[in-house]
């Protein structure tokens, strides 16, 4: 099927690119084609509409490329380079002549062996690196945008809506992937926590802890080189980024727990609290770790 796609075929040809390159590797996800060249990565969005994301038109794909560039430059300005047009003349060419038929996000290529997930498996992540990540995330959150629209996503009403959606979408899997007793236990505990902590959720809003966060902060989205790069923030749906900062912290902590590095998870949380001075975060952490684990289980 891919061989019949003129765009994919062209992007696998070194002559399509503005700089010299050797063999090109294609990585395909359900929403993107990612072309890995010798020194760069070009990400092309597929023309799909899944409801929670809409890349169905060229203009929407361009706008989402621009938004992805803007959002990820907050944490990786040296990696996220530019949005480039793919033009059609006699052949398809990036930044070529003729009509623009597609857009790609151009990024600097980093070595895959520097992905944090792999380094964790190799035992190469220590507390010094975790401390650096905690400092970066705390500073990022302190500078991230917040306003009345964003703050609404931390309200008990919105948080409850998100949980209700989770339960509704997974009820059909009871006794298939989740035992009925576990499902009902989680539902009871989650609803009880929300019912008894209305003041806590309200104070998070008044303390301006609801921000335009990363939205997908796990070890698979962190490069650890001389400079740590947290990449791939969610651009296609603001709802997935606008949240209590605890949700970002909880995602990475949950991921470290999953990889049997609870020691690093605890250290990350402790250092984040020191850097952010957000002592209230501990009260919400189990709640949001459960949320992140539930969502990950839902989408896997």
Model-derived segments and spans:
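Conserved NTP-binding catalytic cores of kinases and kinase-like/nucleotidyltransferase enzymes
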Residues: 1-106, 225-228
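ATP-dependent phospho-/nucleotidyl transfer catalytic cores
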Residues: 52-56, 93-97, 105-219, 223-300
């Amino acid at each position: 099927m891919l061989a019949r796609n003129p765009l994919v075929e062209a992007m696998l040809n070194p002559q399509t690119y503005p700089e010299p390159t050797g063999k090109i590797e294609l990585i395909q996800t359900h929403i993107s084609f990612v072309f890995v060249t010798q020194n760069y990565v070009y990400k092309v969005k597929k023309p799909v509409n899944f409801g929670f994301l809409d890349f169905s038109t060229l203009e929407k794909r361009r706008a989402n490329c621009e938004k992805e560039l803007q959002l990820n430059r907050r944490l990786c300005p040296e990696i996220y380079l530019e949005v480039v047009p793919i033009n059609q003349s006699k052949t398809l060419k990036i930044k070529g002549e003729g009509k623009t038929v597609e857009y790609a996000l151009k990024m600097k290529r980093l070595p895959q062996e520097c992905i944090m997930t792999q380094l964790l498996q190799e035992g190469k992540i220590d507390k010094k690196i975790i401390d650096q990540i905690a400092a970066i995330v705390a500073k990022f959150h302190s500078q991230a945008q917040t306003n009345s629209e964003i703050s609404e996503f931390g309200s008990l009403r919105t948080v409850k809506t998100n949980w209700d959606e989770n339960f509704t979408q997974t009820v059909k899997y009871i006794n298939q992937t989740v035992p009925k007793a576990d499902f009902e236990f989680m539902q009871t505990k989650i609803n009880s926590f929300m019912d008894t902590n209305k003041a806590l959720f309200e104070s998070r809003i008044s303390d301006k802890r609801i921000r335009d966060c990363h939205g997908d902060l796990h070890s698979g989205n962190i490069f650890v080189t001389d400079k740590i790069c947290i990449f791939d923030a969610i651009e296609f749906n603001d709802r997935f980024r606008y949240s209590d900062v605890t949700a970002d912290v909880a995602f990475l902590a949950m991921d470290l727990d999953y990889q049997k590095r609870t020691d690093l998870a605890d250290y990350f949380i402790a250092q984040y609290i020191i850097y952010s001075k957000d002592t209230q975060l501990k009260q919400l952490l189990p709640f949001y770790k459960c949320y992140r684990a539930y969502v990950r289980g839902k989408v896997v």
